Each structure stands twice: as C-alpha cells, then as structure tokens.
C-alpha cells in the first residue's frame, strides 16, 4: 500500500513540474521575456547612455584645452558640442521613458546623468570664462554689461557715485540686487583684486541691527568670524554702524557717510547654446 502511495506522489510531482515547464514555454511563445532578459536589456541601455554622456564630457574637455591656444577658431567646435549635448538630452528622455517600470534602475540612471551633466556644466562655465577673456564675438553673458562675473555672482562697482548706506542699498534694490555679501576669503580676495580708484571706499551689505544687537548681512545672516582679521573683528565688536570695504579690509563708519558701493546678484546659468 505504501509503495502505491509513493508511486502516486512521485507521479503527481512529475506531472506538476511538467505543467510548470509547459506554462513557462507558453509564456515565452506569447512574447513575455524572462526577468533576467529584461534586466540585461535595462543594464545594456544604462551602460550605453552613460558611455554616450562620457563621450560628450571628454569632447567638452578636449575643446576646452584647444580653446586656450586657439580661441578664435572654436565657433565651429562649439556648434558641434551644442549638437552633441542636444542629442544626449534627447537620448536621456528616450531612455528614461523605457525604465518607468524599473524604479531602482531609473534612480541609478538619473544619478549618473546628474553627475555627468554637472561636470559638463562646470566645463561650460570655464569655456564661457575663456570666451569673455579672449573674444567679444560670443553670446555668453551671465552678467549684465558693466558688471563683473565671479563664480555664481555678478558684481556692480559704483565707482563714480557716492551715496549713504541706505541710499546705496536702495540703488542695488533698483538693480534687482543687494549690497555685496562676502561669503568667503576667496570672494574677499576677488574684490580686493579689482582695478579700482586709488582711494576706494565701498559700502558692503553688513550693518548693525539694534533690535537684535548684532551685525547682520542683508539676508539676516551673521558674518563668519573667519572672514575678518583680528583687527577687523575687534573693530566690529567695538563699533556700531555700517561696514565698508577698502583695499581688501573691512571697516566701520556711520551709515550717513557718502561713499561708493558694490551691488551683488546671482549670475545667470551658462547654457551650451550661449557658447557659439
């Protein structure tokens, strides 16, 4: 009796296994690919797109190196680069549409694209800087005319005008900007390096706030102590009024004094199409 039951069980298991195999074969015949096949296709698509982006990045780097010595002959190369970037953007959209049903793969793809495009943007900024230095025949203008460009900001030096701190602040507001805020020692060095008059005095966006009894920039943030020398920091702690910039140093004066000023606003994004 037990032998009959064992034989029946084995026969049933074999028939179930055979049925499962038959079902899988039917699914394949109907056009449903195996999971491993789908993953291989997704991985291949990701790899292809990343390679294309890397090729564009390398092309951009080569163009930048060549521009240093051949700035006047780069308009055709920049046009070619613009076409490459547009093709990459089209490919990105097409690839993303294919992986909507694969969240993990889609997020990985987006992170890789974001990283590569960020590096392309950095190279585009360098190219724009070279264009501004070496030629006037270009469309790359992240700042208005008469403004200076540094990193992500534009600066306006009111050299031939003098106003009180409140009126200087208003003038900057009329230009959709603020009195300059110094965020780093590098920015401080940039301001000091500008070709300015022999005795330049420029208002900064730093003033004493009597209500909070502290020094504040126009965005209500407090200045970092690392921006000041020991002398500057001691002067600020002992004084009240408005801050001005002279020969690379920060001083304090009464806000009613009339001197020049510096406005600052965010620079426009550098676009590839602006480089031709």
UniProtKB/Swiss-Prot annotation:
Q: Show which residues sit on the Cytoplasmic side of the membrane.
A: 1-43
Keywords per UniProt:
Cell membrane, Disulfide bond, Glycoprotein, Lectin, Membrane, Phosphoprotein, Receptor, Signal-anchor, Transmembrane, Transmembrane helix
Mainly localized where?
Answer: membrane
Record Gene3D superfamilies? Mannose-Binding Protein A, subunit A
Query: Start and end of every C-type lectin domain?
Result: 150-264
Annotated signal sequence is none
PROSITE patterns named among the record's database cross-references: C_TYPE_LECTIN_2
Q: Where in the cell is it found?
A: Cell membrane
Give start-end ranges for motif ITIM motif.
Answer: 5-10
> Which residues are modified to Phosphotyrosine?
7
What protein is this chain from?
C-type lectin domain family 12 member B
Name its species.
Bos taurus
Q: Corresponding gene?
A: CLEC12B
